[in-house]
Curated annotation (Swiss-Prot):
Any one GO molecular-function label of the UniProt entry: growth hormone receptor binding
Record key words, sorted: Disulfide bond, Hormone, Metal-binding, Phosphoprotein, Secreted, Signal, Zinc
Family, as annotated: Belongs to the somatotropin/prolactin family.
GO cellular component: extracellular space; nucleus; plasma membrane; secretory granule; trans-Golgi network
Annotated InterPro entries: 4_helix_cytokine-like_core, Somatotropin, Somatotropin/Prolactin, Somatotropin_CS
Gene Ontology biological-process annotations: animal organ development; cellular response to insulin stimulus; growth hormone receptor signaling pathway; positive regulation of multicellular organism growth; positive regulation of receptor signaling pathway via JAK-STAT; response to food
Protein name as it appears in the record: Somatotropin
Lineage: Eukaryota, Metazoa, Chordata, Craniata, Vertebrata
Length: 216
């Protein structure tokens, strides 16, 4: 491995291992750039894990000839489509940082319940770690987003609890077609929602701290 890649890998690992700052009275404040770097790395990691699991599930359970039609049917399935959140980078750039943080928080919190059923629904080869680990990763990202919100609080009106309905739990019975399609749809939404959260965080980081990695 090239020295530059090895160094970059160590830096990314070190950032992922950093704790989020607690109350200001207990710990010194972390620079805003580090808060954003931590949040983006965690969101990227979760999004990649979700995408890999979706692909593994698809490969194991969904016949190739049926995937396209099923994916089209899933287009309006995600509850997150009911909130007025940006659908891509261009739309996200039109929103304030606080708006994007609040949307990101809503997306993350909507999955805190369902992911606790992951290990019961799938075999170990299909699940990225255990459900407890996924839950902990989501909670960690939630905490990081909340830390950013505290730093950037600007007195603007809150988005509010727009996502009234959370996602259902994953079905543990994989013998029926209905259960398979339900879990397939949930994994698709999980992947989409984490991609949105990652996009929002990267847009905010890039417009605050101009860097070469801002093209995505």
């Amino acid at each position: 491995m090239a020295a530059g890649s090895w160094t970059a890998g160590l830096l990314a690992f070190a950032l992922l291992c950093l704790p989020w700052p607690q109350e200001a009275s207990a710990f010194p404040a972390m620079p805003l750039s580090s808060l954003f770097a931590n949040a983006v790395l965690r969101a990227q990691h979760l999004h990649q894990l979700a995408a890999d699991t979706y692909k593994e599930f698809e490969r194991a359970y969904i016949p190739e000839g049926q995937r396209y039609s099923i994916q089209n049917a899933q287009a309006a399935f995600c509850f997150s489509e009911t909130i007025p959140a940006p659908t891509g980078k261009d739309e996200a750039q039109q929103r304030s940082d606080m708006e994007l943080l609040r949307f990101s928080l809503l997306l993350i919190q909507s999955w805190l319940g369902p992911v606790q059923f992951l290990s019961r629904a799938f075999t170990n080869t299909l699940v990225f770690g255990t459900s407890d680990r996924v839950y902990e990763k989501l909670k960690d990202l939630e905490e990081g987003i909340q830390a950013l919100m505290r730093e950037l609080e600007d007195g603007s009106p809150r988005v509010g609890q727009l996502l009234k309905q959370t996602y259902d739990k994953f079905d543990t019975n994989l013998r029926g077609d209905d259960a398979l399609l339900k879990n397939y749809g949930l994994l698709s939404c999980f992947k989409k929602d984490l991609h949105k959260a990652e996009t929002y965080l990267r847009v905010m980081k890039c417009r605050r701290f101009v860097e070469s990695s801002c093209v995505f």
